[in-house]
Amino acid sequence: MYGDGPSQIVEHDYGEFNGPEAGQSIEIARLAREIQSLDYKTGPAVICEAWDQDPRFHSTDPETLSPVRIGAQLELLLEQGQLGDSTLHFQSRSLAFSTATDDRLHKWGLWVAGSTHIRAALRHAITALRRARENPDFIKELWPYN
């Protein structure tokens, strides 16, 4: 992302929070603060799925709106200072899913079997990093303290 060399992901980790959405949001905030205090001078960039309007979408499954509710809770936690120095960014689901397709995740060695939620999070992370590499202003939005 910085410099002219080829980009590579040198290390990544993943996990999944379960249970009530409020609890998941609180755990995301705790993890963001923990990562900052352990390794970095600045907080991590938290990327959250933005709700894309799709006229073909007709699901009545309440879980499909879970990212919207968790995103709203993370906004509240950010406002309350519970995300430390992290920044919170919303990104289009369709952009993330078209950038980091299943085939590309396999090719990059980042495919995680089983959880669609973990794969969705990886898609958003990769997409945000690619956007940052292409746009220095976006890097400053993600990590304004660097």
Describe each region flagged by the PLM.
Residues 1-146:
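Phosphate- and other anionic-substrate recognition elements at nucleic-acid/protein interfaces
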